[in-house]
Amino acid sequence: MYYNKLISVIVPVYNVEEYLEECLDSIQCQTYKNIEVILVNDGSTDSSKDICEKYCEKDNRFKLFCQPNKGLSATRNRGMSESKGEFISFVDSDDVLKEDMLEQLMKQMSVEKVDIVECWYTNDKQELDLPSPKDAEIIFKGNSEEALVSL
């Protein structure tokens, strides 16, 4: 059963003060509670770092790591190197998660007995609706390497 496994939620942060609090609130309110939130500040020049520090002070699941600006890939890699979870979820700093997103992903892993799950998204800001698939036929079956390549 996957329900007791730690998920590392990695959030690259770079000059996103406008969106960041809504993103972090949505992570903090997840129904799946066994998470660590790895915030990697990639040399922000706005108040993004201060916002991250505020969340780290009020919730010990949040951890902040700072680096000079290296770009998104290096920032995600840094987050992975700092993570302790058995599972990893990447969340962009302008994303807002449904409150049960992580729980649903873990549930799907358990039901389907797979190593990797992905979800789609809904873009509320531009009225472009791309809902998550509910049809299990869409689920990729194969080994982890093939699944990663298909993403």
Walk through the language-model features, giving the residues of each.
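Nucleotide-sugar donor-binding/catalytic module of glycosyltransferases
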Residues: 1-151
